[in-house]
Amino acid sequence: MSGRLEGKKIVVTAAGQGIGKATAIAFHNEGANVTATDLNDKTLADLNKEYPNINVQKLDSTDNNAILEFVKTLDTVDVLFNAVGFVHHGSILECEDNDWNFSFDVNVKSMYQMCKAILPLMIKQNGGSIINVSSCASSLKGFPNRFVYGTTKGAVIGLTKSI
């Protein structure tokens, strides 16, 4: 642990597994005060068992009221790392309206809601960083069998640039 992030307060969404978990651990190992959120109680409990100094909080990132209540518990946030995501497999012809809506709710709307809720804290403290995880499926080369996933991750890029 280098301590480079000592005293920094970092929120990581979808921290129960994958990129979110690895990022929460990396920030913790650099000395940050990490709050790891996820919808899955078991993966959060496993993370907390392995890293008891990481604060874990169950949070449905698609529930704006839950997000607003969660943010009320925070005094400052130096970094928001939005890792929440869902991969729908299928082409445009295999994408139903409910697949489209669910994917946008998870991959775009949840990030918008987290950014909107946490940004006032960052403005109040005169700084902070927001990192929204996207994918090369959105820009470098389209993936026809991940039609809606690539579309939503393209929207994440636009969202992030527009903040």
Where are these regions (language model features)?
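Substrate-binding pocket helix/loop in short-chain dehydrogenase/reductase
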Residues: S91-I92, E96-F104
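Conserved NAD(P)H cofactor-binding loop of Rossmann-fold oxidoreductase domains
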Residues: V84-H88
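Residue(s) in the substrate-gating loop at a strand-loop-helix junction
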Residues: S135
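The beta1-alpha1 cofactor-binding region of Rossmann-like NAD(H)/NADP(H)-dependent oxidoreductases
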Residues: K58-E69, D97
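Active-site loop-to-helix junction immediately N-terminal to the catalytic Tyr of the SDR YXXXK motif
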Residues: C95, G142-G150, S162
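Conserved glycine-rich cofactor-binding loop
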Residues: G16-Q17
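Active-site helix of classical SDR
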Residues: C115, T152, T160
